Structure formats: structure tokens, C-alpha cells
Amino acid sequence: MWDSSYMQQVSEGLMTGKVPIDQVFGTNPLEKLYKRRKPKGTVGLQCSPCLISKSTSTDDIVWDQLIVKKTLADLLIPINRQMSDIQSTLSEMTTKVHEIERQLHDITPVVKMGKTLEAISKGMSEMLAKYDHLVISTGRTTAPAAAFDAYLNEHGVPPPQPAIFKDLGVAQQAYSQKTMVKNQTTDAADKMSKVLELSEETFSKPNLSAKDLALLLFTHLPGNNTPFHILAQVLSKIAYKSGKSGAFLDAFHQILSEGENAQAALTRLSRTFDAFLGAVPPVIKVKNFQTVPRPCQKSLRAVPPNPTIDKGWVCVYSSEQGETRALKI
């Protein structure tokens, strides 16, 4: 029979936990419910002892982030400063480049005038060379000493025109102890004293240096580095060594006055002038025959047994390999 008091005791025991459920029902009626709510194979997360010992609080993580941000900021500050300096330098360089471009644009016309300036310079050099030998080219002056002294006594200064003569009254007047002479007159006397050694025979035929004589001959020759330029140099050197450079130049001008050109005059003199008869052409050492002036390369021939200048052999080129070629006109 149903005993209400017993059931009350059982209920109180179950509620208080003094009486186990298995003792009353034999099996736990909630066991199936537990198994249904808790799937098979589900295992709770477990932390390793090493991880549990570490601090994983939010404050530590935030602090680490702040430290990283501060470090990055300290690194970026000098980088930003350097970038600013680089930008400033680039700006200055850009300005300078623009200024250089403007200057180059301004000097471009000057660069284009290079050929013109070179031609003017060459013309001026030739003109100065001719001016230095003006007396030689034009012959003797005819200004008498009396006219020079008369002009000096009247005006007190030498005349502007050149006056070269043997009897120099102005020289005696300049070095006189009793006469007060101006500086211009003294300078004129010093310059004229340099030609006192010239005589009537040697005045129009002075002994020029080989270089000056060759430069005078070049003014009559067309082109550059032609065989006739080499011939002019060789003849000038031989004439200078023999002391007949003045006579050679006088003979050259004489042939030109007859209507011949400079090439014909040099060829004629090389075969008729006494200083060149039987003269042996000089030997010029070169690295190879390609270094010989291009206009002369077509005139190179095999060296004959006894070459002489009066037979048209100008010079002999000797290469480093031991080969020889003669320049023939």
C-alpha cells in the first residue's frame, strides 16, 4: 500500500541528498537526459601548465602594443627628417639643373660659332705672320734719314711710318748726353738698333729660322698636310742650315712674280736651288704608315737606292716594324 509518510521521507531524503536516486529507482532516470545533452566524444579544453603560468591579461597585451608603437614612432622620426632633407636637396638640385639648362640655351649660339671663330683665328694668325715679315715681303724702305730727323725736330716725336736705314741720326741723338730726348724717341732708337747689322746686300735676304720660313711658305699653299707642306718644311730646314733661307725666300717670291703657283715654285726650287742639289731627304720615324698624313699616303713609294731631294724624293718614313716608304712628288 501507498504510505504517504514513507513517500514524504523519501522526498525529503531526495531533496536533501541523503537518499541517492539509484537507491530509490534502481537507475538514474536523468541519465538518458544527460547523455542526450552531452554529445559523445566532447572533451573540455585544457590548458598546458606552461601556458597557465604565463600572463595573458588584457593589460599586458595593451602595454606591449604601446611599447611597439612608441618604438616605431622613434624609428620613423629620423626617417621622416631624412626624407625632408632629401626632398629639400632634390628641390635645390632641380633649381640648379634648370639654371644650367637656361645657361646652356644661352650659350648654344656661341657653340655654333665655333667654326667661324676657328676660321677667324686662323686668318688672324696668318695675317700676324705676314705682318711680322712685312719688310721682307715688300722690299726695302726708301725713307731717308734726313726726312726722319726733320719730322722729329719739328714735332718732337718719331713719324708713325716705319723708317729703316743704315745711317740713324735718331740713334745718335737718343744716346747723346747733351740732348734731352723723350721716351718715344728712345724706344724708337732701341728698336732701330736691332737692324744696324743689316747691310745693303743682306737687307732683303735675312737668314730666317726654319719655322718662320715654313710658315711663310704655308700661306701660299692650299689645304693642310699635303706633300707640298712636307716639302716646304724640308726645304726650309735645309736652307736654314746652309744659311740661305733669305735667298731661298727671295727666289720663291721671284718665281711667284712670274705667274707660277706655290707648288710649281717649290718643285722648281727643289731641283735648281744649289742648297738642295744632291741633298739626302730626311728620315721621319712613325709608328706605322697609317699615322702618315692622309693626303701624303697616296704618294708613298718604295725607297730607291740613292734618293735625293732634287729628284723629287721629299722624305723617308720609317715605321716601328722596320719598313720604309719614301714620299715622292
From Swiss-Prot:
Subcellular localization, as worded in the UniProt entry: Virion; Host cytoplasm
Gene3D superfamilies according to UniProt: Filoviridae VP35, C-terminal inhibitory domain, beta-sheet subdomain (2.10.10.70), Filoviridae VP35, C-terminal inhibitory domain, helical subdomain (1.10.8.950)
VP35 IID domain mapped to chain residues: 204-329
Sorted UniProt keywords: Coiled coil, Host cytoplasm, Transcription, Viral RNA replication, Virion
GO CC terms: host cell cytoplasm; virion component
Signal peptide start-end: none
Source organism of this protein record: Lake Victoria marburgvirus (strain Ravn-87)
Residue ranges that the Swiss-Prot or TrEMBL entry lists as coiled coil: 70-120
Function: Plays an essential role in viral RNA synthesis and also a role in suppressing innate immune signaling.
Similarity-based family: Belongs to the filoviridae polymerase cofactor VP35 family.
Protein name from the UniProt record: Polymerase cofactor VP35
Subunit and interaction comment: Homooligomer. Homomultimerization via the coiled coil domain is a prerequisite for binding to L. Found in a trimeric complex in which VP35 bridges L and the nucleoprotein. Interacts with NP. Disrupts innate immune signaling in infected host cell.
A Pfam family hit: Filo_VP35
Record-linked PROSITE patterns: VP35_IID
Entry annotated with the keyword Ribonucleoprotein: no
